[in-house]
């Protein structure tokens, strides 16, 4: 599973006071978000526009929007979606890009810079394979001169999110969680299950192990949820809950009640 992902890869369009997620976490509150819905017909390549983003911005249930460009990176979509959200809301925009293993370090570094230049709050880099790749990924945020929010930098205005979806990375979760300049660390439970040969129980165990490390060092941890399990996920301690599709609003309403919001 991909993080469609607790505090985390979000894009912020101004200072920290304008970043809704970063308003909530210091208060110990859970943030709720939604995958940016494609405006294309079902089965067609995704389409994201400023008009579509403006419509999403009208929904008061969402604290953040997760723009998933892992499958096909589109800088035009980043800019358009950011503009649409910014016009009428303070919602945080999180953009997920393809993994380093797909397009290489230089391309990934350039994308992080491009996304922040477009005004986004944060970037999510998925499929971090090990500790060394996690260190490499965080240098991209340094190169972009992003003022990254972290427990050590509570006045930061940008979010750096990494996703662990492979067994080796899960095994190195403690060391990765302790890296400087990290905002959100999440486990891609679906992808991890695939890497484990379909072992859903093993993937859930990995998810809980990553969660425990984020709670230990006070990072954000994001996870998708449904109406059936959102209350449990909040009790477990996830602080960024992601919904998708027509059932997202129902899930968030249940989650907000459970979280005291």
Q: Across the structure, where does each feature detected by a protein language model lie?
A:
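Positively charged n-region of N-terminal signal peptides that target proteins for export
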Residues: 1-4
